[in-house]
C-alpha cells in the first residue's frame, strides 16, 4: 500500500474519503481539521484552478506546518485559525455562501499524541494539558484539580465509558486535598489504584480520553458543527465525517438519521402532519472502515469509521 501522510500525521481512510467527497473539481470545499495537511493536499490535487479549499485548525503548530506544505497551491487554498464549531462564520470570512463538500476528521492528531509537551498521552511524564488550542485557558490540570467528585465521575464514565469512574474520581479528589495533581504520572498512579492488577489495556486510556474530550468540548463541538455544516451544503454537496470512537460515531449516526428523515412530527402522532420534505440522503448505509492493508500500516486506523451525508433538496 502506498504510504500517505507525513511525519506529522498519517490520515485514515484517505482514498475512501477523497473519492466520495471531491465530486466537483471546480467546487468549493472545507477541511474542518487541517492537521498535517494530508487530506487538504489530496483535495487540492483533485481541484481545478477554479476550485477552492478552505482549511480550518485551532492548533497554531498544525497551521504553520501545513502552510509550508500547501502554499504551492496558491489562491485556491485559504486557511483559517479557529474551531470548526464556527464553520459558518469562517465560511463567511472566506467569502463563501455554499459549498460542495465538507470534511471533518474528528479527534486528536498523531502529532499531538506524540508531542510530550502537549500532555495528551499517558506515555510521557509531563504536565497535564491536553489543549488542542493552546490559547484557551482550561486544561486537563484544571479539570483534574477543580472539578467536583461528581463532575469527574460523570465525565470519566460518559466520555471514557470507564466502569471504574466513581472510584477514580474519589481517588483524585482525596489525593488533591494534600497537593495538586500536576503531571500525567501522578494521575496514572491514581488510576492504577482503581484497577485490578491485571488489565488487558492501559488503565489510563479511557480516563485520559474522557478528560481530553472535556477539555476540548469535543462532542459539543461536533454536534454544533454538524448543524451548521449542513446549512452550507449545496444540493449535491456532501458532508464526510471520520470518527475514532463509539461516542463520536453514535452522535454522527443519529444526526445523519435525523437529517435524512422527512417527517419531524412527534413519534406519538400516527400520521405525518408537518409536511416535511426529505432534504438529505445518507450515502453510507453502513460506515466505511479501513481495509486490511491500511490497518497493517497505521495502527491508529483501527477504530476509524467514515460516514457521508448528501444534500438532495434545498
Swiss-Prot record:
Q: What is its EC number?
A: 2.1.1.199
* Coiled-coil intervals: none
Q: Where does S-adenosyl-L-methionine bind?
A: 37-39, 57, 84, 105, 112
Q: What class of enzyme is it?
A: transferase
A molecular function annotated in GO for this UniProt entry is:
rRNA (cytosine-N4-)-methyltransferase activity
Where would you say this protein principally sits, based on its record? Answer: cytoplasm
Protein's UniProt name: Ribosomal RNA small subunit methyltransferase H
> Where does this protein come from, organism-wise?
Fusobacterium nucleatum subsp. nucleatum (strain ATCC 25586 / DSM 15643 / BCRC 10681 / CIP 101130 / JCM 8532 / KCTC 2640 / LMG 13131 / VPI 4355)
The root-end lineage is: Bacteria, Fusobacteriati, Fusobacteriota, Fusobacteriia, Fusobacteriales
* Gene name tied to this protein: rsmH
